[in-house]
Amino acid sequence: MAETVVNVVGAGLAGSEAAYQLAQRGIKVNLIEMRPVRQTPAHHTDKFAELVCSNSLRGNSLTNAVGVLKEEMRRLDSLIIKAADAARVPAGGALAVDRHDFAGYITDTLKSHPNVNVINEEIESIPEGYTIIATGPLTTEGLAKEIVEITGEDQLYFYDAAAPIIEKESIDMDKVYLKSRYDKGEAAYLNCPMTEEEFDRFYDAVLEAEAAPVNEFEKEKYFEGCMPFEVMAERGRKTLLFGPMKPVGLEDPKTGKRPFAVVQLRQDDAAGTLYNIVGFQTHLKWGAQKEVIRLIPGLENVDIVRYGVMHRNTFINSPDVLSETYQLKGNDHLYFAGQMTGVEGYVESAASGLVAGINVAHKLQDKAEVVFPRETMIGSMAYYISHANNNKNFQPMNANFGLVPSLEKRIKDKKERYEQQANRALTYLENFKQTL
């Protein structure tokens, strides 16, 4: 019987990690990468895992969620983390890398691996057999059409327009109230009421806030029905007051009166630990977002776990179509990995590739599927993309402590809480490793 070869499409961070995990387990891999045959608007080299934005893989401390994620991956022999450690440059508490050395390490490792066959070509259809699609946010039109045919017409998004997401524990609950507009249905929103003076201060700050630059390949019409709130503000005060900050039907139960303006917060996860700021999709720089958001009553000291973004980002509606192993539901042979699955960030993308790669290897070796515990950062990300209860408006997410189950005992001090969650994650990981 011919040996099974797994196709990994895309040699970014997720695809490179998936290919490595497969190859290290004795599985033959066709790693299919269209560069340099066809370049993307964002890439400049023919190397694998090219970092197209920042050279930072973010925080390295275990009081930082992505730091915990990196440590979990380090303990699972992640190629991406090995490369990052080898190519590290000074960056304080962050793990930053020399881009050239980082990509070179990964490229050389995979090209010299006896189980990896590199194929440089653009494909417009999904290969037959076991396949991991890891083509990233700039997936070509032909392949995107094929993915739509397989997943369903409403399951592939081309623009990431997400409002900021915050931790519930950091909201000043004395200043907000639970209510749905006109009391329809259950009280599902936390409402931050504003006086006219507070609104004016907020409005002026929005007008003065600095927007992020837009890449050429992102300049498309994604504002229809999803306009950045700072663009609404530029059209005049009333645009916000008749839009996302409309107070009608949201009387404050403490006063019985209608506030001048209201910012609504909507639960974003099943556990109720994360909330998004309704209608606040934005192009503002992250520092500007924090300053503006902290002018909202009740959010003066809020912890933002995911800033608002609007950019080109091809991703699927994962809660409807993917399992926790990153496998397409109802299709034993097809897996996805990387930003396309709804994980956000370099490290998160690589982690999804690690999970997908291990699972395909286990399937071919007749071993049990690998579902990481939710207490781990790897497991919490896999659970989020497959179970998010906002599947009608699913948006990508990066690693954060709001995704893992709460500790049994509530700890008010944030640093201590994060340390305990980190220790728990690594304990669970070590125990889980014994089953791999």
From Swiss-Prot:
Catalytic activity field: uridine(54) in tRNA + (6R)-5,10-methylene-5,6,7,8-tetrahydrofolate + NADH + H(+) = 5-methyluridine(54) in tRNA + (6S)-5,6,7,8-tetrahydrofolate + NAD(+); uridine(54) in tRNA + (6R)-5,10-methylene-5,6,7,8-tetrahydrofolate + NADPH + H(+) = 5-methyluridine(54) in tRNA + (6S)-5,6,7,8-tetrahydrofolate + NADP(+)
Keyword flag Ubl conjugation: no
Gene3D superfamilies assigned to the protein according to its UniProt record, in alphabetical order: FAD/NAD(P)-binding domain
GO molecular function terms noted in the UniProt entry: flavin adenine dinucleotide binding; tRNA (uracil(54)-C5)-methyltransferase activity, 5,10-methylenetetrahydrofolate-dependent
Record: residues binding FAD: 10-15
SUPFAM superfamilies for the chain: FAD/NAD(P)-binding domain (SSF51905)
Compartment(s) of residence: Cytoplasm
Required cofactor(s): FAD
Main location: cytoplasm
GO biological process: one example: tRNA methylation
One GO term describing the cellular component: cytosol
Keywords linked to the UniProt accession: Cytoplasm, FAD, Flavoprotein, Methyltransferase, NAD, NADP, Transferase, tRNA processing
Alphabetized PROSITE patterns for the sequence: GIDA_2 (PS01281)
EC number, UniProt record: 2.1.1.74
Record has Membrane as a keyword: no
Family: Belongs to the MnmG family. TrmFO subfamily.
Functional description taken from the UniProt entry: Catalyzes the folate-dependent formation of 5-methyl-uridine at position 54 (M-5-U54) in all tRNAs.
Name of the molecule in the record: Methylenetetrahydrofolate--tRNA-(uracil-5-)-methyltransferase TrmFO
Species for this entry: Staphylococcus carnosus (strain TM300)
